[in-house]
Every structure is written in structure tokens, then in C-alpha cells.
A protein has these predicted regions:
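Flexible loop and strand-edge segments within Gram-negative outer membrane beta-barrel domains
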Residues: 192-198, 202-214, 222-303
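Gram-negative outer-membrane beta-barrel transporters
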Residues: 357, 447-449, 468-545, 571-572, ...
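Short acidic/polar hinge/loop motifs at secondary-structure boundaries
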Residues: 71, 99-127
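Extracytoplasmic beta-strand/coil segments of soluble accessory domains associated
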Residues: 60-99
């Protein structure tokens, strides 16, 4: 792992005082203070630690079965791209503790090069969010958040899993805290030979091996009743081999290393909070055209970030929030089409929130980004939420969002284009939430208009080049139903969702590629005393893979069913069994790369 040791000194403050609804820093410290405010106006779905264990092989698998996100994966464990609401991976922001971590090289994230274990909160937000979270937050955002608790003493846990295809997952976490000091560390190691076979397709996932290692460290200290300093770091090292279609094919691989470090200094009073953060992130990769030879190409990227978030209640009903950020981005390519790059960028955002009653609230925001050599648009957002009656609430969100061109888009030789302008989108969506006892139903229609779409196209000169091209209209419906009930020792929990997505290229009036029109997920949990059983289903509709909507080349609809059972003794020891793809379905999320058929895993957890 060729990451240089880096020291980051920063200052930060978490503080949010929205009607006294949030936990104070006396109990828990959350690095992404903005998220608690976002939840006042937007629907955010949280995935619990227990739910993560249902789909523990990767972040890709978890989001595929437990969110509205469509995951395009070049076979299990290979390159994986997330997309919301008929958009693309470039319109999806991945946010680590409030910091946007999309690759500067690609402008998007490979979910299989992001660790799954180690976070305290994993949350999914659909819809625009560039005012709060920056570039690419057009279709939605995925939030990976850490928190540090106080007054808990010593806590720890061990998790180990063995699964089909030579897959092993191990995760350990330990922490200690008293009233003023909190410390937490965790480590994860996952490896898989990943050599599954799909006989119906005459396919063997040759050269599919992968592994990854993650270390997380976090600490926080209360200087006084109003000041707290905190630090969180993550180190990740991974290797993916890319599948080949013939026995004697050329074997390739991709190695990646990331380092993320964030230091924070928080100041908090009853009506005023300030959060000053400094972060350093590093993303390195090496591509091997032959796994037995030295690297063929690669690149190193470094980001230096300082961010301040000030939140002030002028009156109990009026709240102002100012956010400033400055970054220095550097990159160095190695035989990859990129040379040496340095870019400065910053932003200033302001939000005004008004709470006329406990059941009615409004928020308006404006933001201006300053990106070196790129003209960025003024962004805005407006949100309102009304709890009309006990059983019904509604909300509306209107926003302008953007995506800046990536380093590859701008500087790749040949084909990069320094004259590109950012993509911009106008987003409109509504939330209608109905509650009937323990049952909750949410309907969220949406519309997006994206212009200056950045696309790579073939040229007469024998290479591909990038241009601002067509416009795209995306519209549809996201829905979610939840139900939870306890009957003595019996417990039942249901979480399901359906997404209808139309994403139309206005130049051709055809559906965008790799955008399923229909997707549905369902998770049912049953508990009795120490026993837990779950069933999990995924339906994915017809998915076009060509721009002319050619059905012969489209991915067929599919349904996949998973299930698992576990038992817990003394609230400390858990043993479980999972069966994935019980239906033995043959399916693909990317053409020519089938996913695994029926497979199994067993796992054990110890809490202490």
C-alpha cells in the first residue's frame, strides 16, 4: 500500500439545534452535522447494522437488495456503478462523514472499492443535494457516517463469515469511552476466490478473485461543555481481478488504496453552533495488463479540504446556516493519459429555515461554487414540509444541482476536453406520507431535467472524445412501505419499495441505457425470542443496453429471493445461516457478466 503518511490538523464543530430534537454532544458525536438538518425536509432511509449482515459481501449487494438504487456490476466483486432515479453513477454522490468522496478521475465511485463494514450509520437519500453535498448529488447520495459515543465504557464485537466461492469476511470493532473521552477502532478483511459458474450461460467467473482490507480509527475529547475535538480516519487496500471469458485469456487486475482522515473542532451553545473541519483524502490505483507483470498504468490523487458549517437560531422559529468550503485537488498519472494536475475549488452556501409551527417548516438555500478554469452555475434549493393531520404529511423539494467534469473528462490524452461546462439539473419531487397505526406508506413522484450531459463519443480520428451533448428528462415514482409490530415475544418487520423510472434522451426520445423501468425490493423479518428469520426479494424489470431500445440486447427481467435464519444467546452470541438466490435465477446487471446462482454462507457474532 503506497500511501504516504499524512498528518491532518483540523477544527470542527457539530451542532444542530432544530427544536431540540437532536441528541447533544454529551451523549454522541456525529461527524456529518448537516445530515440531521437534511432529515427535517427530505426522506432519508437508514440501513441498520443488523440489516447490513443480510448482504454482507459488498456495499453493491447491500444497496441492490435494500434500496431504490440500481447497481450495475461487471460480475460479482468487479467494477460497480450506482444510480438513482434513472441517472448514472456520475449523478450519484458518495459522502463520507459529510465529505464528498467521488473520484476526481472518474467523477463517480466504484462501490466495490468502498468498504462496507465499520460505519455507524449508512443512509440513502434520493433527490438533489448539491447545495449541501456538492458535485454529482443530482439523482441522490449515499452517506457513510461515523459517530462516537460517550459514557459507554468498553464495548467490542467480532464478526466472521464463510461463504460459497471461497469467500471469507472478518470484522472486529472495539471502543472505550467515559464522560469526556471516546475512542473506537475497527478492522475488516474480506477475500473471495469468486469462481462461480453459471452453466446456462456457459460462463465461469475466471480470474474473479478479490480481496480488501480496511482499518478505521476514531477519537473524540470534550475540552469543555461547549468545545469538542474529534478525529476519524479510514485506510483501505483492495485488489480486483477482472473476469475473462476463455481459459487461456489474458488475466488483468486493478489495485486501489485510499486514505481518508478528518479532524474536527466543534463549538456549541443553545442557539449557536459552529463546525470547522479539515480533511485529507488520497486515492491511488494501479492497473495491471498482466497480473504477473509490473503495473501498466496508474494514478495518485490527493485532496486537501477545509470546511466550516455555522448554524444560528435568530429566534426559536428562524434559523440561518452558512457553509464554506475550500479544496486543493492534485493528481499525477502514470502512463494513463493523465499528467500532473492541480486544481483549486471552493464554495459558499447559505440556508434559511423557518418553523412557523411544529407541523410546518420551510427551507431555502443558495450556493456558488468557484472551480478553477470552470464556470459554475449558481445553485439553489427550496423545501417545505407539512404534517397536515396525524395520518398524513407532505413535502416538496425544488433544486438546481450540478456535476463538474472529472479529471479524465478534462485532461485525458487523447479525447479530453478543457472546454466542457458542468452538467446542471432542475429537480422537483414531492413526498406523500400516510400512517395507519404501525403501517407507513410513502409515495414520492419526481422529475429531473439534465442539460449539458457529458458523454464520450467516437471520433473520425480513431479515438473517443468527450463532449457536452444531449438533454435528459427523468421522471417517475419511488414508493416505500414499512410495518413493524411487536406481539409479546413475537416481532414482525416489513420494509418494501417500488421504483418506476423513465429516463429519456431528448435527442432520440429513447430510454437511457442501464435504467430499469421497474425495480422492487422487499425485506421481511420475523423474531421470536432469541430466533430471527428473514426473507428478502428483488425484482428488476427489462433493462435496455443499447441506445435504440433493441429488446434482443436488453437484460431480461429477473426475480431473486434470499433468506436467512439466526439465533442469539445472552444477547452476546449469534450464529446464522444465509441462502442467497434461492430461486437459482440466472441474471445479469451488465451484459455478458452473469451474477452467482444459489449460494450459501454461515456467520457468527460475539458482542462484549
Amino acid at each position: 500500500m503506497n500511501i504516504k503518511k499524512s498528518l491532518v490538523i483540523a477544527f470542527s464543530a457539530y451542532g444542530c439545534f432544530l427544536f431540540g430534537q437532536e441528541k447533544t454532544i454529551d451523549t454522541v458525536y456525529i461527524f456529518d452535522s448537516q445530515m440531521s438538518r437534511v432529515k427535517r425536509f427530505h426522506r432519508v432511509n437508514a440501513i441498520s447494522t443488523e440489516d447490513i449482515r443480510k448482504n454482507s459481501s459488498s456495499l453493491s449487494e447491500l444497496l441492490r437488495f435494500q434500496s431504490p438504487v440500481y447497481i450495475k456490476e461487471n460480475g460479482r466483486g468487479a467494477v460497480s456503478s450506482p444510480s438513482f432515479r434513472g441517472t448514472s453513477a456520475g449523478h450519484t454522490a458518495v459522502v463520507w462523514n459529510g465529505i464528498n468522496i467521488n473520484s476526481n478521475f472518474l467523477g463517480q465511485a466504484d462501490l466495490n472499492n468502498i468498504p462496507l463494514f465499520g460505519y455507524d450509520r449508512l443512509e440513502v437519500k434520493s433527490g438533489g443535494g448539491s447545495v449541501q453535498y456538492g458535485s454529482s448529488a443530482i439523482g441522490g447520495s449515499i452517506h457513510l457516517n461515523d459517530q462516537l459515543e460517550f459514557g459507554k465504557g468498553f464495548q467490542g464485537s467480532l464478526y466472521s463469515e464463510a461463504a460459497s466461492f471461497g469467500t471469507y469476511i472478518n470484522f472486529a470493532k472495539a471502543g472505550f469511552s467515559n464522560d469526556r473521552f471516546s475512542f473506537k477502532a475497527s478492522a475488516n478483511y474480506s477475500i473471495s476466490q469468486n469462481d462461480y459458474e453459471v452453466k446456462e450461460k456457459e460462463y465461469i467467473n475466471r480470474n474473479g478473485r478479490y480481496y480488501n482490507t480496511t482499518f478505521n480509527l476514531g477519537t473524540s475529547y470534550k475540552l469543555s461543555s461547549h468545545h469538542i475535538i474529534s478525529w476519524q480516519s479510514q485506510m483501505f487496500d483492495a485488489s480486483q481481478r477482472y473476469p475473462i471469458f476463455v481459459e487461456n485469456g489474458n488475466k488483468t487486475k486493478y489495485n486501489a488504496q485510499t486514505l481518508r482522515s478528518l479532524v474536527a473542532w466543534d463549538f456549541r451553545q443553545s442557539s449557536f453552533t459552529n463546525s470547522l473541519k479539515a480533511a485529507y483524502t488520497e486515492d491511488n490505483f494501479q492497473y495491471f495488463g498482466d497480473i504477473d507483470q509490473p503495473k501498466t498504468s496508474g494514478a495518485d490523487g490527493k485532496n486537501y479540504i477545509i470546511k466550516n458549517d455555522l448554524n444560528y437560531f435568530i429566534t426559536p422559529k428562524i434559523n440561518v446556516n452558512a457553509i464554506g468550503e475550500f479544496q486543493v485537488n492534485t493528481a499525477e498519472g502514470y502512463q494513463s493519459g493523465l499528467g500532473s494536475i492541480r486544481r483549486n475549488m471552493g464554495s459558499v452556501a447559505g440556508l434559511l429555515r423557518y418553523f412557523p409551527t411544529e407541523d410546518l417548516r420551510f427551507e431555502a438555500g443558495v450556493k456558488k461554487d468557484f472551480v478553477e478554469d470552470i464556470t459554475s452555475p449558481v445553485l439553489f434549493s427550496f423545501s417545505g414540509k407539512w404534517n397536515a393531520v396525524k395520518w398524513y404529511s407532505t413535502g416538496m423539494n425544488v433544486s438546481r444541482n450540478f456535476r463538474i467534469p472529472s479529471f479524465n473528462d478534462l485532461y485525458w490524452k487523447q479525447g479530453g476536453n478543457t472546454n466542457l461546462v458542468p452538467e446542471t439539473s432542475l429537480n422537483v419531487d414531492m413526498d406523500h406520507e400516510f400512517r395507519f397505526g404501525s403501517l407507513k406508506l410513502t409515495l414520492s413522484p419526481y422529475f429531473m431535467h439534465i442539460k449539458n450531459y457529458i458523454s464520450w463519443l467516437p471520433t473520425p480520428y480513431g479515438y473517443w472524445a468527450v463532449f457536452n451533448t444531449y438533454r435528459v428528462d427523468s421522471y417517475g415514482l419511488e414508493s416505500q412501505v414499512t410495518y413493524e409490530k411487536q406481539f409479546g415475544k413475537h416481532g414482525l418487520k416489513l420494509n418494501g419499495g417500488y421504483t418506476y423510472a423513465r429516463s429519456i434522451n431528448k435527442q432520440t426520445d429513447k430510454q437511457m441505457v442501464y435504467v430499469p423501468i421497474h425495480k422492487a425490493v422487499a425485506n421481511i423479518d420475523y423474531r421470536y425470542d432469541f430466533l430471527r428469520v428473514y426473507v428478502q426479494g428483488l425484482f428488476n424489470g427489462l433493462t435496455y443496453t443499447t441506445t435504440d431500445e433493441k429488446k434482443a440486447d436488453a437484460l431480461d427481467p429477473y426475480f431473486v429471493l434470499n433468506a436467512g435464519v439466526s439465533g442469539t444467546l445472552n444477547k452476546k452470541y449469534t450464529l446464522g445461516l444465509k441462502v442467497n438466490n434461492i430461486t437459482d435465477t440466472v441474471y445479469e446487471t451488465v451484459s455478458y457478466y452473469p451474477m452467482p446462482k444459489r449460494n450459501y454462507s454461515i456467520y457468527a457474532t460475539i458482542n462484549f
